[in-house]
Amino acid sequence: MTIQWPSEAIWEAVVPLLPGFTVEVLPEIDSTNTELMRRARAGQLDPVLLLAERQTAGRGRLGRSWISEAPEASGSTHPIASLTFSLGIALQPQDWSGLSLAVGLSLAQSLHPTLQLKWPNDLWWQDRKVGGILIETASVGALRYAVIGIGLNIHMPTVALGGEAWRTPPASLNEVLPGVEAPDVLQQVVLPLVKCLQRFEAQGFAPLQADFQTRDLLLGRELQCSDGALGTGRGVDASGALLVHTASGLKKISSAEVSVRPRS
């Protein structure tokens, strides 16, 4: 089934903000993030949106896999069960802290008022994950190139990878926005994301802190951190660090290597 991607419309909207911007759509690749990082290390630093209809070695945070299967493999009858793309862009913010939170906020604001954000890089809906973000950077000379990978569930597959039933099913955007398809979502999120990145480059995360708090999944909830700490979510600070009130006081978590889960 041929999918009509809004490549030209996205290019026309974004190129005035990012001269030299291109849009590429591939039927299959190992990972859009991996490909853009390969290009960056080879000196290719132009702004680009790279989309793959299928990723065979997609990656999430902490090395977790994100594989976008063909519809028949996932049990879906829709042309694209998940939307996976990466945006490559040179950025020079004074402080990189909070970038993944800014990206997540932009996506949630573009898509639906009920989407929530789980620190540091996930979109959730009704206590189930609907998407994730992976940000990597490459330094080439004085430039630093950011590769922002995004994966969003569009339709719920009927089976988990490997043919087993889901233990805890993720959410899909079709539950939130009935009838939406991957090309619609792509066109809806890219231009606001570029504007968000340019604002972040100029102002950092601090101006976004209050808006993030309105969608903060962990705020006020009992949390368990992968380092063993237990506490209650107290939001994020102006740098995007997670604040957790523990028995020993207020704990600030700034490392994305620490995983945090709600206990209730």
Summary of predicted features, one role per range:
Residues P19, Q44-D46, W119, R128, ...:
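Short, basic and Ser/Thr-rich N-terminal targeting/leader segments
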Residues M1-I3, L91-L115, W125-S264:
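Long, positively charged amphipathic alpha-helical accessory segments at protein N-termini or as interdomain linkers
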Residues M1-S110, R263-S264:
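N-terminal lobe of the biotin/lipoate ligase/transferase fold
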Residues P27, L117-W119:
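Short loop/edge segments at beta-strand edges and connector loops
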